[in-house]
Amino acid sequence: MRKLAVIALAFFAGGCTEHAPGAGPADAGGTLVISTTADPGTLFPPFVINVQAKQITEQIYDYLADVGPDLDTRNEKGFRLGLSDRWRWSGDSLTLAFHVNPRAKWHDGRDVTARDVQFTFALNKNPALGGRMGTELANIDSVTVTDSLTAVFWFRARSPTQFLDAAAQLLILPAHQLEKIPVDSLREGAPPPIGTGRFRLRKWDKGASVEIIADTSNFRGRARLDRVIWSVAPEFTTAVTRLFSGDADLFDALRPENLQQLARYRNVRTILLPGMDYAFLRFNLRDPMNRARPHPLFGDRDLRRAITMAVNRGTLVRSVLDTFALVPVGPIVRAYPTTDPRGAQLPFDSARASRLLDSLGWVRRGVDGMRAKNGRELAFTLIIPTSSMNRIRMGPLLQEQLRRMGIRVQLEQLEASTEGDREARGAFDAALGG
């Protein structure tokens, strides 16, 4: 697992924009074109890290059960059925048995079995794969199979997230397609996805578009839409233009200034929804030149705290997103009913930040007032994906706030896939994530 630290900067109140849909059975069929600012990068669930990939893979594959519309993960009764049609807890709440829906089939016609569930867990836990699910699965000791349709999760300890961890963290993968492929080969590139979802992959033109089509024989019934296309425009302005010109039906990242243009486009309407996003400043805790060593700056916890206190998050949020976002309570979505808004946070306190930097030996030098220690200037590079206009605008504001504190920040804008690759390899100092 990569070791990172983050300062949560903004929680987006959201803006889901779409052409007005019809209603009733006559509205079934057709194509939905979604304008988006980044390519998914991968459609192999263990490696999914961006929103686009998550949106697509969740249509192709299924969880055993999924979080319901109220987003309450505390009560399993609020979860929606997925591949499992029922489940049963043991008396001590340390085992959870899922029964796979016997009607569920893979897109190639093969039956879904409990072995697929067991294989999916083992693959995601395999350190040789280097997937992203280590933390989420830490409390699950193992998965066993009692019959062809029953998979049993064995937990290390009771916790409030047991059901969520077992039911809705893993998109179930086909053992018959993947289990004979060496893990190293899966890391280099997985085969085309075979899922159980109500859509199957038709075409992926990397960097341009992804198209999925309805699985007409799906065990839950055919999807209402015939197909969905994600149209990739790496530049934010291009993505918005596709919506307004009618080349796309939906864009879910409108900014406040875009709302002023809506009066000219009667075929487009806006729906404001609580957002599921937050932006954050991510510190790399390992040295990009040698991952065995701590980062020469951010390996110091007190330095990270000083930088955190030097950032006025409220000003950043208001300047970039006006009233359409809130300062988050941490790296968590406010829309979740489990989010406690009273959580303790480091405050914006420039005087305290300055004193802490001085005590660490980072003192102001020269006419420009930049801080230095043992001949090294307190400076780092911040990478920003060009797919996010919010983060592009936030970068210079953050840069200026830290300059006033004597910290030099160099901004580096990168195409989204390049930025994501840099983060995955640990080849960065800090990043604006979201």
What is the predicted role of each segment?
Residues C16-H19:
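Bacterial signal peptide processing site
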Residues D85-G130, T146, V152-W154, W230, ...:
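Aromatic- and charge-enriched surface segment that lines or borders ligand/interaction sites
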Residues G68-R74, A167-A223, R227, T237, ...:
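Gly/Pro-rich hinge or "lid" segments in bacterial periplasmic/extracellular proteins
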Residues I34, G109, V268-R269, R403-G434:
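Periplasmic binding protein-like
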Residues H99, G134-E179, S319:
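Surface-exposed binding/hinge segments that line
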Residues E211-T216, L297-E400:
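Append "and occasionally in soluble cytosolic enzymes with long acidic Gly/Pro-rich linkers
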